[in-house]
Amino acid sequence: MNIEKKTFVNEDEKNIFQEQKEALKSIFEKLDMSKIAFVGGIADYLNLRSYYDMPVNDIDIIYENEVDLLPIQEQYGIRKYCTRFYSMEAGEVLVSEYPFNNKKIHADYYKRNFSRIKLTQSPLLGKMVWHASFTEMKEFHNKQVPLITSQAMGANYEWKRLYKHSKKASLYNNVCYLEEKNLLQTLKNNL
């Protein structure tokens, strides 16, 4: 486990931008990590880093109780926005900004019932964190693609959003395909 953890720390150092590392460091220090979980780009990174060399582009976090975000609210402030892209329980996203070298790194917080999402734990920058599982994120990206096409979205269509979900769905689907192919080859060799 220590060798694997060290390898992942090296991977994390390489694939996570310095600004995001600083924001994550603040999150690790301020929040109870047992009361939040990562989704979005960080969950994708954690689920796929053994297969692909991919950067982390955003920080998306789910929580059950807004009171658990108070340490962030008190130090950095949190603003509420309506979310039109994802069907969420509260219909809103909370956003905090972490200043670093004249830049602001955004973290998005979504209210979710943890019992309705498959979570798992993995090391991130040497800390164990909860995040959406491989299966959960694969299903999410595959379900998002038909919902965000130009035909489905009309005037709200964003090609970058469709591209992002299509690409991530393909990465997850490819991993599953390769694992199934390897399993079939192993079975064939054992017969």
Q: What spans do the regions from the language model cover?
A:
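Helical scaffold of the NTase/Pol beta-like nucleotidyltransferase catalytic core
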Residues: 1-39, 46, 180-191
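Catalytic cores of NTP-dependent nucleotidyl/adenyl transfer enzymes across multiple folds
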Residues: 3-7, 102-191
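A generic structural signal for short, non-catalytic loop/turn and secondary-structure boundary residues
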Residues: 31, 54, 100-102, 124
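General structural signal for secondary-structure boundaries
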Residues: 40, 62-68, 98, 133-136, ...
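Conserved catalytic core of two-metal-ion nucleotidyltransferases
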Residues: 76-120
